[in-house]
Every structure is written in C-alpha cells, then in structure tokens.
Amino acid sequence: MITTAEAQHKLTAPPSPAFDPIAHRYSHAGASLSSVSALIARHKRPFDERGNATRVAKREGRTVEDVLASWATKRDAAMDRGKQVHAEIERALEPHIGKRCAEINPRAAESPLAKHALAFLAEWSDAELVAQEARLMLPESRVAGTLDLLVRTPHGELVILDWKTNASLRLRAERTWADCKMLAPVAHLDDVAGSHYALQLSAYRLMLEARYD
C-alpha cells in the first residue's frame, strides 16, 4: 500500500512536462505536447455558433450580433468564475498538503463554491492530500495535463479530483441522434460535458498509472 510520502515522491520525480501559462502549452524535451482538454476538443462535434445564434435571434426577436455578444459575455464570466474558485481552493489547501482532510477549514474560503468544495473534502476526514496542480504526461502519446487535486484514502487508493464550476452538467444527450455523439474513436459517447470530463479524468488516470508503474 502506497503512503502519501511515497505518492508525493513519485509524482514530483522527473520527468515532468514544462508548461507555458501564457500560451497554455505543454512541452517535453523540446517537443510540443497537446493538452488533455485540446485532445478532447478535437473529438467534439463542431458547434455552428453563427447558425445557432441566427436561430436564437429569430426566435427571440434579437440581432445575431447581440446573441453572439451575450454568449461571449457569459463565456468570459464563467471562465473568470472558474479561475477565481480554483485559485481560492488552491490557496486554502496549500498549507494542508500531506496532511489529513480533517484539518481543512471550509471557512478559509470566501465564495460559496469554494466553501462547498472544502467542506466536501473535510468530510473525507482520514484521507490525506497528496498534491494539487500536478503536471502529468504521456510523452509517447504527446499529451499532457494538470490535475487539480490528488487525494490518498486510508486504504492507499489514489483519488483524482477536478473542480468544475459549470452552471449545469449534462450527463446524457437529450436526443439519440448520431449528431449528438462525439467523433471517432469515441463516437459511442454523448457529446456532453459529462462525457468530456469523464475522458479528462480517464486521461489523468492513465498518466498516473504510468507514473506509479
């Protein structure tokens, strides 16, 4: 059974991918690596933004540009909220890395979403925080990613957590049509956020298994 200290050592031991936060790009040994999110995005069905905005504008008596602008505003606000919550959780957890979740104080955060996340972790009382914002990669597949948090249970199991701040999280498509599916080789999955996030966590799991093999 792996200990928290052993898990931390294996996780931080080289090699690890380099990351450029400005360009949001990973690299290793001079080679560019695709991010997990970019890899998954290539298997989503293209969204006809203008075509859909045209339909919404006609239905609601608005201009297409107004609809597009409102979508962009919502998208930017959602991204800002996600970054804020992630940063808040990270700051609150940093002093507790390597320690039991029971020591986490949900009141260390200000926003309701961050408080809920910390309260959720605190309920895992005997689990321990291994690491957060850990960079991983599969160099042979030219893909890399950063997991939000890794937790070790009292039984030695490693659990990956990834914080999401979506207004909603669809697990299934509302229709069964072919155009509601992702692209090959994952065309059996509904093209919804639930599938995208499941693929993301599965990729992190593969990277961890390679790291701990």
Locate the predicted segments by residue.
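Charged, glycine-rich intrinsically disordered N-terminal tails and low-complexity linkers that flank
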Residues: 1-84
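DEDD superfamily 3′-5′ metal-dependent exonuclease/proofreading module
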Residues: 2-3, 9, 13, 17, ...
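A structural signal for alpha-helix termini and helix-coil/disorder junctions
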Residues: 42, 46-49, 91-95, 123, ...
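Catalytic cores of nuclease domains that cleave nucleic-acid phosphodiester backbones
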Residues: 73-186
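A generic alpha-helix structural signal
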Residues: 68, 117-118, 205
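Metal-dependent nuclease catalytic cores in nucleic-acid-processing enzymes
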Residues: 189-213
